[in-house]
């Protein structure tokens, strides 16, 4: 009698967010077999324990899920005697991948908050861009972080804190945005935008003008 070894749950990101993905269960089959002879045993997948026990309604491979969370029942049987079988189950989970919408270039005037309004450095409240990144997506489902490189955004490292003071890149710098599914952080996308800081001009004192009107008009 074959042994239905433990199969890890599947967690997949849905890039087009239609809730449907294709599964071939190749890795799941390797886990079920766990070294048992694949020529001596057959593995099938079902949507209920009863179907797995009776070997009915086996799922076609590739399988396209109908719900974002499903329990899959696995049957492994001896090809020489199909009454010798074992079953196990695992969960299939599909998560939405958020869209990182375009953020327009942000332009701001330098100020005296740091004592110098001509050094191209000022605080920017990055969280003010969250709505632009979301563009209608549910903020409760996704987390947004800001980074100074694409690599940091992809690896979700070195997130910069809002408000951010650009003490290393005066006048202009790029910000890389990561938006991820709060339930499955591997489901994410990124975008980037530029922040330009302009020197605030000084309005110097102008002397009053006094003129004579020769024709008195």
Where are these regions (language model features)?
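Extracellular low-complexity Ser/Thr/Asn/Gly-rich intrinsically disordered segments
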Residues: 1-217
